[in-house]
Amino acid sequence: MALHVLEALQHGVSVEAVLSDPKVAPALGERRRRQAEMDTVISDSTEVIDRLAIARLEGRGLRSNGYHVTAQVGDDCDACLVVHGDVGASFGEQDRYPVSASFYTNSFLHTAGGLYDLTRLATRFDPDGGGHANACGCRIQALETGTRVDRVVTEGDIEANLAAWLEMWAER
């Protein structure tokens, strides 16, 4: 599809003609439908706490990036945290992946960089977590009394990870 669109544009076909092309229009309609569905899911699954938007997408088989979340929440958040994946899953399982968290600065609001180094959150419990200060991630970790333990992650662990991250965020 992308090659078809690119070749049409290279041959001088107008954008309007490309968008109404019988090969493109149905795919574009489907993409718009999926986008509207994701907008609804994000809206229904997101809570803003202390200017941190928390989107709970775990167990839904859906993934979204934080830019989508921060675009929807707008100026009410300085950053977002997206929880996604499947509780109890591990790497290598077909159609399932470990429950994880992604962190993003609201770059629509903070164009020169965020107010907080989000890698601090991503590396708090996960030694493999990290990324960029304004966009990073980690796996949710199994915790007992705030310490990482070697066992399958539960729903309670998601809550424990979130609670610790919210404490850290509050100290920014």
Language-model-detected regions and their locations in the chain:
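Glycine-rich, Lys/Arg-enriched anion-binding loops that position phosphate/diphosphate groups
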Residues: 1-76
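Glycine-rich, acidic loop segments that terminate in or are immediately followed by a histidine
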Residues: 53-172
